[in-house]
Swiss-Prot record:
Listed GO MF terms: phosphatase binding; protein phosphatase inhibitor activity
Gene: Ppp1r36
Protein's UniProt name: Protein phosphatase 1 regulatory subunit 36
Keywords, in A-Z order: Protein phosphatase inhibitor
UniProt subunit comment: Interacts with PPP1CA.
Functional note: Inhibits phosphatase activity of protein phosphatase 1 (PP1) complexes.
Pfam families in UniProt: PPPI_inhib
Amino acid sequence: MYKGETLFSIPELYPRRKQFVGQSSTRLDQCGLRLGMWYWKDETKSLEFRSFTPAVELKEKGKKGKAVHFAEMDGTASERLTDKRFVPRDEKSAKTLEKRGQQGNVTLDDVKFVALLSLQDTEMQRVCSFTTFMRNKSLDSFLMALLYYLSYYLERLSMEKKPQSYMVGLVEKKEIELVMSKLEDAQKYLAQKYCKLVLGVGMADKHHMNCGKDKISDTQKDWKFFESFYTFCTCIAWIVFRRQYLKEIEEEVGRLFRTNMFNIPRRKREDEESGGEKKRMTLVQFRRMMAKRPAIKKAMDMRSPVLSTLLPSLREKAQHIAEKKYVAGIKLQPRVEKDITNLESVVMPVVGILGEPRNLFNPHTLLPLESEENGKTSGRNSSIVERNNTSIQNTLNLVMSKLTSQNSFPK
């Protein structure tokens, strides 16, 4: 047996132990463990624990001197603190957050949040690889450029759908020329922002070659990112434009960022217009159709319309010139090329619901509150009509049953 206090450990003044204590004490405290040693005390004839951290020992000594009882700390005083002080603060904070959420105007961050939530059910696997890119500044500038372009594109569609007279007036020509010039400038501005994303500026972790650091291209990562990216852009534009023109937005986004060979919305539209005639083609007709399509090598080197605005081939240049001459039966005048870099300093116009007060929209879906109320009232009206129809049908059935019963009795 040992006399006094028998220590079964290394002496306290050992320098390596102090270094170890300083490095790992915080980790062990988080796990609920302490560094120390067990020793035998002859006075109490029991094992006792001594901690290596002096700060803890000082605190314990202070507590022993004051004779603090833990039962008192868990009594009614703590209950009064939690019940009367902390709970009202949480309720007040929730109310203030709701009020702050209703204040201000709708921003692009609000639309991104709603779009991400709406896509989680259907496109969860693709969108998960895109969530880390949500707060990138290059993404915000690209989305604003896309919305800026789509606003003029939808304006052009509305002008084309208007009934046109045989003699187009001078005012209509000026309006069409103005919209087409703005649309062309917006497409060039969008192309610059899109090229930054393709080159991986500010997003090396999403680039297929890690911006030149990797020697092998990760095509799977590139495909997943851009597929989720196109879906996300379509959803954002649909929400911004009050959940209208979904088909037009899908087709235009597919046309901008895909070639004709890989444009899925265009193929769907062509199949709907043809009415399934391609399935009933003869072999000669099928060969003629396939002869018009480019070879695989050419299809791999083809550029999307957005990229071809900045880096067009000779054939694409000639095709774009021929398309721009005549729009809606009107010959457009050639105009001088503008410096697109000046668009950076120009304040973007308010597009769709962006910039409008938040209190006019549902914070979870960004739907206008008026449309939701109209939908509820229309639902109520439809339910009333259904009830009336059922009651009328019941009375008619009752009358018919009585008539048949009267006719069945003998006279």
